[in-house]
């Protein structure tokens, strides 16, 4: 994801030895609204335009499909809309271009700290590292393996569908009240 790709990019850029272990084969689908703040550009020295699907400068909020509130986003650059499979893979490719190694389709099975290094066991072998970046997402096992208290989880679902034909693509739409304890974006 974006956190792992970003960490890999910056570490590899500094000349560190970086191995990215990705459970899925890249690019991989990820249900997501796809809104990215253009402010991230200042943290990178490459152009994101190849992976920006759309730039959006207006947000519209509704309650039970009525009572609309609309506002222009007051930033220099509009919000970037991206497809997560394309965006995430792009970040990892940037890391690889700086020297990181990618092993996708490589699920981590366990981690263990030995006196001065981490041992990472995967279905494809065991890897050793002095440092470990746990960027496996909110539902990943790393936090538990590292001994962090498990947060109280609430069930949630994500569904991604194409916008209706004729939909105004210059606006991000947020609908509240239609789904209990949730929203539609």
Question: What is the meaning of each model-derived region?
Answer:
Residues 10, 14, 26, 94-185:
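Predominantly flavin-linked oxidoreductase catalytic cores and closely associated redox partners
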Residues 27-31:
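A short beta-to-alpha transition loop/helix N-cap that caps and shapes the active-site region
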Residues 37-90:
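A conserved beta-strand/loop capping segment in the N-terminal third of enzymes
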Residues 1-20:
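N-terminal Rossmann-like FAD-binding beta1-loop-alpha1 element of flavoenzymes
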């Amino acid at each position: 994801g974006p956190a792992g790709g970003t960490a890999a990019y910056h570490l590899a850029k500094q000349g560190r030895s970086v191995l990215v272990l990705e459970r899925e084969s890249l690019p991989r689908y990820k249900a997501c609204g796809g809104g990215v703040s253009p402010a991230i550009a200042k943290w990178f020295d490459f152009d994101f335009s190849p992976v920006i699907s759309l730039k959006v400068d207006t947000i519209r909020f509704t309650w039970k499909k009525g009572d609309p509130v609309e506002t222009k986003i007051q930033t220099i650059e509009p919000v970037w809309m991206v497809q997560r499979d394309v965006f995430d893979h792009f970040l990892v490719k940037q890391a690889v271009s700086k020297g990181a190694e990618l092993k996708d389709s490589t699920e981590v099975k366990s981690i263990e700290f030995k006196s001065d290094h981490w041992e990472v066991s995967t279905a494809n072998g065991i890897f050793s590292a002095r440092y470990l970046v746990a960027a496996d997402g909110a539902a990943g096992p790393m936090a538990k393996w590292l001994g962090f208290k498990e947060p109280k989880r609430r069930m949630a679902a994500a569904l991604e569908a194409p916008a209706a034909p004729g939909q105004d693509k210059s606006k991000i739409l947020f609908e509240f009240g239609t789904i209990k304890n949730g929203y539609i974006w």
